[in-house]
């Protein structure tokens, strides 16, 4: 059975996981300009980072950033670029299913770190946002390496601030790209149109999760 986005009768919600009813999302048709390629973009924001003391930062790097780096290392053949600054983690993938897998792994990894291990008097959380669309590679002279830019990167960045802590919000394009992958173990629950950050507009968004029996 394939992985599709479906309309749930009665409650107006949609999810991914079976061929039922009318498929709302058709195969995405994305026009590429010269020099562009399709990619999946993830932004993550670590909740509680602003409460850390200077003396907490080495432990944060060891217990939060290092495990996330290892997750990305495990998928390095599909990771086009990655970066972090403060509470933010950014990664671009050439495969939307790998991006979804990494998003859920990051969610699980950060969410499961015990405050006793960190030595903090509070738990850290994470919110993640994903988008799929045309991105443009450029060489960044400041970083000294290739990175990716474009309006689609900005769109993903504007979704992350409105994501509920502990959740992964993705765009319709991300959900549709996943829907084309046969047997992909993911589900996307339709959230409705959501106001994005910095007056970027309203977008139909989905909550990404692992598929369960009955989806």
Question: Which functions belong to the PLM regions below?
Answer:
Residues 8-15:
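Residues flanking N-terminal targeting/processing segments that define the start of mature chains
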Residues 23-102, 109:
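Catalytic NTP-binding/metal-coordinating core of nucleotidyl cyclase/transferase enzymes
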Residues 16, 20-21, 156-157:
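Short amphipathic alpha-helical segments
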Residues 92-212:
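Catalytic beta-strand-to-alpha-helix segment of the class III nucleotidyl cyclase homology domain
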């Amino acid at each position: 059975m394939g992985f599709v986005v479906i309309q749930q009768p009665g409650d107006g919600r949609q999810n991914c996981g079976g061929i039922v009813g009318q498929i709302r999302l058709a195969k995405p048709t994305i026009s590429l300009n010269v020099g562009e390629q399709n990619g999946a973009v993830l932004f993550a924001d670590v909740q509680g980072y602003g409460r850390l003391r200077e003396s907490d930062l080495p432990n944060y790097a060891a217990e939060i950033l290092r495990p996330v780096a290892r997750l990305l290392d495990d998928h390095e053949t599909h990771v086009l670029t990655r970066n972090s600054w403060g509470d933010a983690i950014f990664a671009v993938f050439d495969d939307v299913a790998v991006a979804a897998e990494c998003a859920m792994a990051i969610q699980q990894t950060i969410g499961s770190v015990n405050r006793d291990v960190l030595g903090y008097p509070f738990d850290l959380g994470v919110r993640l946002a994903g988008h799929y669309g045309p991105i443009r590679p450029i060489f960044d002279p400041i970083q000294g390496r290739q990175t990716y830019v474009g309006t689609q990167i900005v769109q993903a960045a504007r979704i992350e601030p409105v994501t509920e802590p502990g959740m992964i919000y993705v765009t319709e394009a991300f959900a549709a790209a996943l829907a084309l992958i046969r047997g992909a173990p993911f589900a996307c629950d339709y959230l409705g149109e959501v106001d994005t950050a910095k007056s970027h507009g309203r977008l139909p968004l989905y909550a990404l999760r692992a598929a369960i029996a009955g989806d």
